[in-house]
Every structure is written in C-alpha cells, then in structure tokens.
C-alpha cells in the first residue's frame, strides 16, 4: 500500500545542527540549496569552477570544490548528471566520507546499478521531486510544493529515515506529500517512463505521424501543427485532469476517433515492446549500454542525437516558430 508523508508526519528535525553539502548547482541543485537555506539550514555548495560556481556565489552560498564541501558536511546531496556522478564520487566524495555521514541522491541510477557503492557505515537515501528544479523552487516560494519520492538504501546510523524525511521537509516536499519507495523502484519506473512514453515513445509517435502525413502528400507545415504543435494543448488538459479531462474538452468527433483509432495505432504488440524495454532496464542492459557508451566518449549517443537533429520535423518547426512570437523560442542550433 502506498504511504504518503506530509509536514505533520515529520516529528523530528534530524537535520538540526547538521551541515548539508549540495553537490551541483544546476536545475535541482539550486532549488534544493535555496529551499534548505530559506528554511534555516546550514548549506554549502560543492562544485567545480565555472558558471554554476559563480552563480552559487552570487546567490549567497559558501562555495567550495567538491572534496572540500564533503569534508565539512554531515549530509551530502549529489545532484550531478548521472554520467559524471561515478567519477566525482570516486575521486572527490568517497575519500572524504566519514562514519554516519548521509549520502543522498535525487535519482537512484548510480546506486541501483552499482556505479556508486558507498561504504557500509554511511546512510544512503533518496529524495526525488517529481518536477524540474525551477518548479521545485517556484512552488516553494509560493508556499506549496512539488510531490516527491523518498527511499532508504542504507541505514548505518539508525537515523536514515528521519534524515531523509527531514530533508524532504527541508526542501518543502512534505507540503505536497512524499511517497515512500526504493532506489530500485524509483530508478526502473523513471527510466521506463522516459524511454517508453515521455521521451522515446512520444517522440517516435510524433515523428511517425508527421512522416505519414508528409509521405501522403500533405504540407509539412500542416503536419507539424497537427501532430506536434497541438500536442501541448492535449498534454495541458491531461496534466490538469487526466484523460477524462481531455475527453471532456475535445469535440465528439475527436473523442470518437480516440476510441476507434487509438487501439489501431497502439496495438497489443506495442505493449509487448514496452515490456521488452522494461526488461532491458531491469536486467541492466540499458544501463550497461549507457555506461559503456559514456566511457567511449558517447559515440553512439552523439551519433543518434545528430540524426534526430536533422529530421525534417525539426527544420519545419524552427521555421514555424518564427511565425509565433508568443512562443519563447527554445530552438537548439548547432
């Protein structure tokens, strides 16, 4: 049964008197650090020199190289990209950990797949907001929050659960509610959602729809509007009220087409393919492929990225967005 924790459920402030090092100052890093600081906690930033280092200083934080930040901290939250966490941990974090430190993550990838293997005498926990950093920060300032997940991998001190819940409350997450999970469950469901639906599934669905219309002789501009541009309208309705809200809001023609044609596109074979994707996540095939490609300079990754950048739908989209000044352009030029 799903367990959800709110402000009133966090009885003990296990962060009181502890120093927190937030490693990284990107999307999640700036939000966690600022929310914790606003709640009165002692926060330092660990990061390499660069724009984020300078930005953290401008925001009023004490900023140190990662190793120095870890040395002085009791709780270390690692908020770096998955592909660099392993090296940073090995070279800068692990040598400076002390007994009963707490090592924390917002995504379980490197712990679950064994890239990072903490010593047995430190706590390891997860606090994962289900939204981007800018939303975590904005909702906090507004007095609300983004729902989050939390989980415990190691409880060396006997206080890991209290520390994790206190951390979740510290970033404001318990205002909305935090759901208890495990590193395994968070990692595998997150990767599956990205690959089968949110990123991989949706992008290929849109591309295939665009190609079908263009190959049938329709103008690429109209195809773009029908299968990509208008997606936002549907997703916004879905975000606010689920599929029922979509079907309530669209025309009867569109709703009828949903029922009779959706199953022709997403056939039982698609679900079987989704199961295969999930299996590759569960058995480590995907993580091994990603990790090995990273070691080889991301040759496969960059090749695939370049192929997608050149798709006709991207060229048409860039041109059409120039006609819509109400859209804040986020075109990625190379």
From Swiss-Prot:
Q: Which cofactor does it need?
A: Mg(2+)
Residue ranges of domain KARI N-terminal Rossmann in the record: 1-181
Record keyword S-adenosyl-L-methionine present: no
| InterPro entries, per database record | 6-PGluconate_DH-like_C_sf (IPR008927), KARI (IPR013023), KARI_C (IPR000506), KARI_N (IPR013116), KARI_prok (IPR014359), NAD(P)-bd_dom_sf (IPR036291)
| Catalyzed chemical reaction(s) | (2R)-2,3-dihydroxy-3-methylbutanoate + NADP(+) = (2S)-2-acetolactate + NADPH + H(+); (2R,3R)-2,3-dihydroxy-3-methylpentanoate + NADP(+) = (S)-2-ethyl-2-hydroxy-3-oxobutanoate + NADPH + H(+)
The superkingdom listed in its UniProt entry is Bacteria
List the Pfam families hit by this protein, alphabetically.
Answer: KARI_C, KARI_N
Q: Where is the active site?
A: 107
Q: Where, in this chain's numbering, is Mg(2+) 1 bound?
A: 190, 194
Indicate the segments forming the KARI C-terminal knotted domain, all copies: 182-327
One GO cellular-component annotation of the UniProt record comes to:
cytosol
Q: Enumerate the residues binding substrate.
A: 251
A GO BP entry is: isoleucine biosynthetic process
Give the enzyme's EC designation.
1.1.1.86
Cofactor details (free text): Binds 2 magnesium ions per subunit.
The UniProt annotation places NADP(+) binding at: 25-28, 48, 52, 82-85, 133
Question: Where is Mg(2+) 2 bound in this sequence?
Answer: 190, 226, 230
UniProt keywords (A-Z) are: Amino-acid biosynthesis, Branched-chain amino acid biosynthesis, Magnesium, Metal-binding, NADP, Oxidoreductase
Q: What does this protein do?
A: Involved in the biosynthesis of branched-chain amino acids (BCAA). Catalyzes an alkyl-migration followed by a ketol-acid reduction of (S)-2-acetolactate (S2AL) to yield (R)-2,3-dihydroxy-isovalerate. In the isomerase reaction, S2AL is rearranged via a Mg-dependent methyl migration to produce 3-hydroxy-3-methyl-2-ketobutyrate (HMKB). In the reductase reaction, this 2-ketoacid undergoes a metal-dependent reduction by NADPH to yield (R)-2,3-dihydroxy-isovalerate.
What does the similarity note say? Belongs to the ketol-acid reductoisomerase family.
Protein's UniProt name: Ketol-acid reductoisomerase (NADP(+))
The organism named in the record is: Staphylococcus aureus (strain JH9)
